[in-house]
Structures are given as C-alpha cells and as structure tokens.
Amino acid sequence: NYTTQAIQNDTFAINLAHIEGKLDAERFRARLALQTGTSVNANYSNETTNQKYSNQNSVRNIQEAYVGIKLGKKTWLDAGIYMGNIGFEAWVSAYNWVYTRAIVLDNVPYYSTGVRLSHEISDQLSVQLHIMNGWQNITDNNKDKALGMQVAYKISDKMKFTYNNFIGNETTAPTKTDTIGTVYMYSNEQIKNYTSPY
C-alpha cells in the first residue's frame, strides 16, 4: 500500500502545505513558494547540516525561490531553487493525474538549485540546459557541479515527448583511498498523452 508520503501511521498530520507568490512580467519573472509538512521533513533530511548559513533547517521550508530574465524572444535564464526537471509526476500531489503517486517519483529529484536556460525553438520543440549544485540538494555537498538537459517535442495538442538527463558527481566526502568518487547519471524519456479517460 503506497500512498502519497505516508511517513506516519494512525495519526492526523499535514503532508504538505505551501503558499506561493509569482511575478510574470514581459522581461522578468520570479516565484517564491514556502512549505511545511511531514513530507518536507522527510525529503529535506539529506540536505547538508554542517554549513553555517545554508543548512537543512534553513532551507527545507523553501519549495521554490528563483528569478528569471528574458534573454531573447523565446529564451529565459532562471537562477535559484526550482522544481526538478526530471520525472512525469510532481511532488505536489494536486498536480498529478492521480492522487496516489508511482514509486518511481521517489527516484527523481523533487527540486534543483542552479541556473536553467530554456529556449523555445518552435511551437513544437523546446530545450533546457541546467547547471546545478547536484541531485536534489540546495546546499552543495561537494565542489562539483551537475549538468542536466531537457528536450521536449509536442507531437500534437494531446501528445508530448520529453527527454531529460542528469550527470553529476554526488560523492559528499571522498577518502584518500576513494578519490574517483561516484558519478550519477539519470536518463528519463516520457511520452505524455493528454487524452482524458473521462
């Protein structure tokens, strides 16, 4: 029995509550979303705890905090904390097709911190490039940055193909005998069919 984020049983609790503000201007955009709940405590438990100004306690209530500037007619550059680009379902259950999520969602990053360059090549084709602190972390856990990419192709009004990837070194503290570290690669292809079952 796998439900949304059931980290507690037989108790009343708030899974996720958030409030957000958004700015959409012609050349600038921004979003700030604050959050709390049991899923927040669980999902931010791997954030770095030893940094003075950015640590697990100071960042876990930030769902998104980014600003963007329009570089061209169909090109945006965003910087800050934003929802992860990989995966078919969202962390906020209300945004999903069904309330009970797939277990695969727990193997993709809910959020990313970094810089995102997005460009709409045509009405059908768009691309994104990401430079991030790493796999689902706000405070960088090492000196290396991660890279990500997305290519989305709208086949029709009811169907879209999306390809995402991620590559990055996610080793937190390599020892003298482990200097190579761990490189984490993720590739995700998804086809969305927008036909309603109802």
Where are these regions (language model features)?
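Outer membrane beta-barrel
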Residues: 1-136, 143-148, 152-161
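Surface-exposed beta-loop-beta
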Residues: 137-198
